Amino acid sequence: MIRNSMKSHTELLSWNLLQKEADRVRLNSDSLTCVVPDSNNYESSKQINCIEYDYSRQRVNRTIIDLLIDLANEVKLQEKIDNLINGKKINISENRPALHTALRDLGNKSIMIDGLDIMSAVINTREKIKVISNQIREKKWLGHSGLPITDIVNIGIGGSDLGPRVCINALSNYISKEFNYHFISDVDPASFNDVIAKINPQTTLFIVSSKSFTTKETLLNARKAFALYEDTASIDQHFIAVTAHPERAYQMGIKTVLPIWDWVGGRFSFCSAVNLITAIAIGYEQFVELLAGAHDIDTHVQFTDFKNNIPVLMALIGIWNNNFLNIHYDLIGYNFKEYFVPYVQQLDMESNGKSIDVNGRMVDYATGPIVWGGLGNQAQHSYFQLLCQGTHRCVGDFITLKTNDEHEINSMCHYKMKVLSEGIQTIENPYGYIPGNMPMNHLILSDCSPYTLGALVALYEHKIFEQSVIWNINPFDQPGIESAKSAHREITLSSES
């Protein structure tokens, strides 16, 4: 373990002032109104294009927000945001940039890595995505037997699975109904067999996504898919690989390969060729809308002052809850489609589930929270009881669609937020007492379009990055995952010898 004389973030002036504010809040914990006495002219909602952010139910006031912004300034958050987007090598353990933002940059600026402009490769790959998706949608991409494609199967795991799943599920009103979409990520044979039972191999396209092209689960399922065809000559039109190591895909017999690069983390690959299945499903023009939504959040986070910066405010209020109010369970409840929570779980916990800071020291403060949740209407019959009267304190992000304002689903969400924030006190029934005071954000999306989904995903990406800066950890590596892979390889080699 590296030890040096650099200050811990808990020694910063703003951190200690925030600790004093937290002590005062705890003394007045019986009522949210006790937390916000200086609320005159205090704005508790912000908006950018398709997303409104309401944090009026958070246990913060103007003083606390100002101190959180002071903390952001003390750790040079603006400089770190600029470094992220401009391609500095901020992934220090792997000595490379984390340039997922470049994937959705639709402008003409150059972004340099080691003297090379990467944008030409990004634009070239986008053009390949356009050509492939158009050919398949126009029935011009034919299988080995001359039949057009009817089924697309995405084989991948982690970021190569969850991002595409979110899109196909959330954008159901936009996807072409002329195709069937399937996902294989598990090595459980039943998972593979369930998909294969639904398809005709002669009209199926498999997209095999693996950044390293050594991911055991993905390659195992890819080889099983290969076995559906008579010989290697017949697989050419049925397999596309997405990888940072095209030579490994060629070696395996896949001729059509789209690149991803080592400067894109798997869990941040939402806007890359990993999401080819979505470009096919919604069409390339709508796929560009998804990129545009994400890019507009990139611009917002880089050029908006912190008091009006939605990802920054979400990050800072999350720090307040996690590090000063000691609430380490982060619920995400939403009223549109599935898979968003699993996606954010991986994005957040794999990025910020760290206890070693960028200087190689054990931290002396809490880092990434436990992220959980699910569909809001199902919460009523699962974990809502725990939120109301349980002993574990939680914070929540509740996400609703403005287009559902006239529907029961939104009124139920508003009722839940009211009960959880205000509580219920009844003298007649002491068993019905609900303390309330659960801190929560409310994100109101204008719709569930590709543009809005791209913006929502980018919002969480930036929130997570900005929290990593406050915690002084690297969100772009995953040594725990890598060590588990190494241990598995050693066990496999030992059993084979």
From Swiss-Prot:
GO BP terms, alphabetized: gluconeogenesis; glucose 6-phosphate metabolic process; glycolytic process
EC number: 5.3.1.9
CDD domains in the cross-refs: SIS_PGI_1, SIS_PGI_2
Annotated keywords: Cytoplasm, Gluconeogenesis, Glycolysis, Isomerase
Substrates-to-products reaction catalysed: alpha-D-glucose 6-phosphate = beta-D-fructose 6-phosphate
One GO location term (cellular component): cytosol
Active site per UniProt: E350 (proton donor), H381, K485
InterPro entries: G6P_Isomerase, Phosphoglucose_isomerase_CS, SIS_dom_sf, SIS_PGI_1, SIS_PGI_2
Protein name as catalogued: Glucose-6-phosphate isomerase
Taxonomy of the source species: Bacteria, Pseudomonadati, Pseudomonadota, Gammaproteobacteria, Legionellales
